[in-house]
Amino acid sequence: MLPSNEPLTALGRETTTPLSIQLLLFVDDRPSSQEIIRQIQSYLQSLKSDYPIDLQIIEIRQQPHLVEHFRLVATPALVKIAPGPRHTLAGSNLVEQFKKWLVRWQKAIKEEVKNHHAEDAQLQEVEHSGELIRIADEVFRLKQEKEELLEQLKFKDQILAMLAHDLRSPLTAASIAVETLELAYHQPDTERSLQLREQLHQQARKQFRIMNRLITDILQASKSMAAQFTLHQSKFYLQSLCQEILSQFTDTFQEKTLIFQSDIPQDLPPVYADEELIRQVIINLLENGIKYTPAGGEITLSVLHRTTQKVQVSISDTGPGIPEEKQEHIFEGHVRLKRDEGKEGYGIGLSVCRKIIRAHYGQIWVDSVPDHGSSFHFTLPVYR
């Protein structure tokens, strides 16, 4: 609700009576609504009245619960809430209706004053109406908080299921490798058995590293959500977001004569994330790909519905690639590679990207072969 106007009296003169006409004007964003506000305020300022008129402007987009409370079916609408009884005006000729009814309302106040009942009755009516509005505001706020908390609980349950699924695969693979390794130790020490043992050792170590990374991501996500980011998560579609972002890069692709390919299915499920933060991640990864891809190279953006629980976004380029031993470290701050000489390095950008994705309980990683380009991937939870 917009701050209420000061009680409007005739030509600004003060009145000694506490009686007043309490009005609520409900408007939307249309220019015609602004014109009605102007006309009514102008009329009130020029009015000669024995009683102050308190006009409050209500924007229905910001206070939909008040529209429901007063049972309005059209806007703009004017509601007299005091003195009682309540009266609602609406329609294309709202200003003319108001002028006509205002005369009647003022006469009614005079009659009430003569009967010596008006003052107490109106004070009670004003207090009652004000309390109703305050209660309606509080109920609306509590409903919003409840909906947000329910969404968060639903999201947490989904994340737990997703993490359990992600941990099960490497845990099963590691268990099989260890059990097979135990059997291998009972075999004669031939060259083949020694090679098998080494392969099993490597397989087990690899799976344990995957589990360690997943657990680290979970812990970092908790820290990120608590200390580094204020997430405003909601349901949205990556198709629309990606198309918006790509439209911003059309000129850049042409200027650098880059070939751009996209693979974004239209039947992707919605995701549950902070849309603006995910926008930053995609833009950062695209800018990096453009920066390191030579003229005539190729940039690809693809989105894949990997499982029922997550969606994967991939951005690939045909740049110089990243050495295998550096691929994990590039997500740390201030890391520079040989190819960064003369350029602004990945460093801070990728570090922030990882923090954002971890805050959503997603994963981000890179696949790259030197001299054959890089593919950056990240996952987001599906909205269910």
Swiss-Prot record:
Domain of life: Bacteria
Entry keyword set: ATP-binding, Biological rhythms, Kinase, Nucleotide-binding, Phosphoprotein, Transferase, Two-component regulatory system
Entry EC no(s): 2.7.13.3
Catalytic activity line of the entry: ATP + protein L-histidine = ADP + protein N-phospho-L-histidine
Domain Histidine kinase: 162-384
Keyword field contains Phosphoprotein: yes
GO MF annotation: an example: ATP binding
InterPro entries according to UniProt: HATPase_C_sf, His_kinase_dom, HisK_dim/P_dom, HisK_dim/P_sf, KaiB_domain, Kinase_SasA, Sensor_HK_Regulatory, Sig_transdc_His_kin-like_C
In-chain residues carrying the UniProt-annotated modification Phosphohistidine: H165
A biological process from GO: circadian rhythm
General function of this protein: Member of the two-component regulatory system SasA/RpaA involved in genome-wide circadian gene expression. One of several clock output pathways. Participates in the Kai clock protein complex, the main circadian regulator in cyanobacteria, via its interaction with KaiC. KaiC enhances the autophosphorylation activity of SasA, which then transfers its phosphate group to RpaA to activate it. In addition to its output function, recruits fold-shifted KaiB (KaiB(fs)) to KaiC to cooperatively form the KaiB(6):KaiC(6) complex (independent of SasA kinase activity).
Domain free text: The N-terminus interacts with KaiC, while the C-terminal histidine kinase domain autophosphorylates and is probably responsible for self-oligomerization. The N-terminal domain stimulates the C-terminus to autophosphorylate.
Subunit structure, as described in the record: Homooligomerizes. Interacts with KaiC. Participates in the KaiABC clock complex, whose core is composed of a KaiC homohexamer, 6 KaiB and up to 6 KaiA dimers. SasA and KaiB(fs) compete to bind to KaiC.
Name assigned to this protein: Adaptive-response sensory kinase SasA
Gene: sasA
